[in-house]
Amino acid sequence: MRLRSSFRYWTYAVFSVLLLSGAAWLVADWQKDADEAWQQAAANLLMIHGGAAMLALMALGALIPLHLLRAWRARKNLVSGITVAIVNALLIVTAFGLYYLGSETVRPWMSWIHIGTGFFLALMIPLHIMLGRRARA
């Protein structure tokens, strides 16, 4: 189920900002003990990442009726679509855990799951798009 190009490109941009800000934060976080500038960069990148996440939640909410439900009824691109939906749900749950759970025991696990899942989503979205275009052709 093809999306209107303006919404499609906006969604691509939001998820690109999420990926880039998350990856850049990871680098800054690893370097934060080396220099105070890295610590400040990590904080700024986390704010950008959080803001982009809010926009991504809006995009995901719009995608449910505009794309997901229509594709589900048409039985198109189900495996990769369900995978993308589950991965996004896992990212939302782990982000919630990172932000709101104060447990120092759970936090490292939640962080690594969130990071790994985020990079997996960066692979799944282009795959989902490619499979959808191939099925339509």
Give residue spans per PLM region:
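Membrane-embedded alpha-helical bundles that constitute the cytochrome b-like, heme-associated redox core
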Residues: M1-A137
